[in-house]
């Protein structure tokens, strides 16, 4: 059996084909058209090209930067705005003449890492994607848990837990709320915190980590604050979901110094003072989402 996964991004649409062992046997990437009908055509053409190349008909899963509303059956909350309000799964199923499964891209990330990635074989896995924003997804026994409202995993838009006096800044999040986790533990939040504490105007976490590795004390303090905030935020997740593993993706996942610090701090913040949940770096990097889309058709 061949599984096709499609990642519908804002600038590119990517397809991969996985064989029955999860080995990649085909990949192609094309620019994303900014029109709904053209997006449908592009996805259909990619699937048909892959099937022609491999001489096989396969299952199709699609990851999107939004969700299918369980109430209306239409896409919502997508930053690729031209797919909002559209019955994407139904339209693709009709055009490809088979059921097409569609899920949030963060959920696809979680499914990928839970199926054959960093958390392979674990039951309940939370996938965390931290870059310019802060998203998440839940895989339960290798399958998406979207929840009754279709927003399962949106941990970044809860308030930062156990805030201290210096953190009560009433920082507004793009979602309209204040002091969301995302405003502190996103890559953007990491840079803003460093700049506010130093008066500098750096533009990326890479610059901060370069200073850290040169022994700069302000960078060391910024990373300590960041890891403490991330550990507090993840501890809330663990207290509620108690996952076997949390897998980190996105740009911040490339900072290797984060993992041991956060793993140790979880013992401080998780109820009971002991945490067995593993905090892991992703295995498949930027390919994890598209692989997870393919794995929406899980192994039987």
Where are each of the predicted segments found?
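Residue-level detector of high-confidence beta-strand sites
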Residues: 27-29, 78, 147
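A charged helix-plus-loop insertion that forms the helical arch/lid used to bind
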Residues: 74-84
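Hydrophobic "anchor" residues
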Residues: 24, 75, 144-145
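A short acidic/small-residue loop/turn micro-motif
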Residues: 31-34, 83, 151-154
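Glycine-rich phosphate-binding loop of actin/hexokinase-like ATP-binding domains
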Residues: 120-181
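Short loop/edge segments at beta-strand edges and connector loops
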Residues: 102-106
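ATP-binding/phosphotransfer module of carbohydrate and carboxylate kinases, centering on a glycine-rich
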Residues: 1-59, 69-72, 90-100, 115-122, ...
